[in-house]
Amino acid sequence: MVYRLIDELICYGIKNQLVDTVDEVYVKNRLLELFELDAYEKSDFDGEARPVNEILEDLMKVAHEKGIMEEDTITMKDLFDTKIMGMLTPLPSVVQRTFAEKYTESPKEATDYYYAFSQATNYIRKDRIAKDEKWVTDTEYGPIDITINLSKPEKDPRDIAKAGKAKASGYPSCLLCRENEGYAGHFNHPARQNHRIVPMTLGGEDYYLQYSPYVYYNEHCIIFNKEHIPMKINKATFEKLLEFVEKFPHYTAGSNADLPIVGGSILSHDHFQGGNYTFAMARAPYEKMFVMKEWPNVTAGIVKWPMSVIRLQGKDLAEIADAADHILKTWRGYTDKEAFIFSETDGTPHNTITPIARMRGDLLELDLVLRNNITTEEHPMGVYHPHSEYHHIKKENIGLIEVMGLAVLPARLKKEMADLETALLQGADIRGDEVLAKHADWAEKWMSENEVNSENIHGIVQAEIGKVFAKVLECAGVYKRTEEGMKAFDRFVEVIK
């Protein structure tokens, strides 16, 4: 059985250009060593390899039966199957050389190769990504994307216990650091033997390209600094983002903001995120144009979007970065008490920007999303953050991906929504249900507005979740979509013109 699986895995590796036929015997011997076998026996494998997750699942059963893999928990299996795939994955030098060769043909050819490679190695676990629920909801801002993220597996209690006992090594410093490439991992850190990164230069500094293993959208990539240095939004950030989309014109690239609440989950390591995807925000049109007198060649305007966005367009990277820097510096020091915008309180800064770059035809485009992280007693998690009436759907920070119009919602919603649908169809008392009670006000509202039945309830629930997400983005907008809010936005525009 095990010899057949080894043959099947090597066949998969050759077919997916991970293993060169020259290296076939070498890889086979490494796998024999891993499975504590001294000899090889020819199997009856017929040459048709299954998807890699199925082959690995069978190999792990063998490893568990033989006592090579102690327990069959999710974390243990992830550590072990990544170790297996690491034996098939080419050295970093090979991947970097191939990427560079493909790039000379075209940037798209290079990323096509690298994305296919990152899936073939099982670094991107396609079988898990396929579990994510995705749909599109029409809103006044156009169609927006909703996903319920199910690809991160729940931790097994045995794994949690082991992780609690494990010593913190501090190596690699975080999940983004380049030292992850080839790292074996442990109970508190994922294995990355099958992980390969691609070097590049942005703004004269060393960066690396990789894909997100969770792929929230097509070719979801991360561009991270060689050094473990904190996130910072400044003129250099704008220049680097614009330079990246010049190098990869089919990709978008943005950065999370550099302050808590409005920033992402990793503020400690300078990085951007991008990918080959047209976000709803990119489809949103200009709503109001204005001219910046020092940068007449840069097209500027407010975008029709639930958050407060200024879009800059032009052909000259330096001019756009200059204009963006002027807006950033002005915003960092800007206070408008009437609009409840305070640049700082007690010396703590509140204003920053979430920037997103893309090519639009032959024009460079930079969207600047105005952010503010002030908190109050009424809104302790943030005034410009999802408000409490929407926490039953989304209470987490609104980071870069959400800003662009893609909701990444917690896995708990899948079961909660299924249970809610069943309860409503049965006429059950959801207010008396410990888990579902939080959805009661929301559900009652749309139940009264629709003729709900078993055929349409799922579609209605999805559409209503989408509407909540649009409202959540409005919460995060510093200038509200009201007459008063737009007048306040105009006041800021007058200052930057």
Report each predicted region and the residues it spans.
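Helical scaffold of the NTase/Pol beta-like nucleotidyltransferase catalytic core
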Residues: N194-R196, H228-A253
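Catalytic or ion-translocation cores adjacent to nucleophile or general acid/base/metal-coordination motifs
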Residues: A236, V245-S265, G274-T335
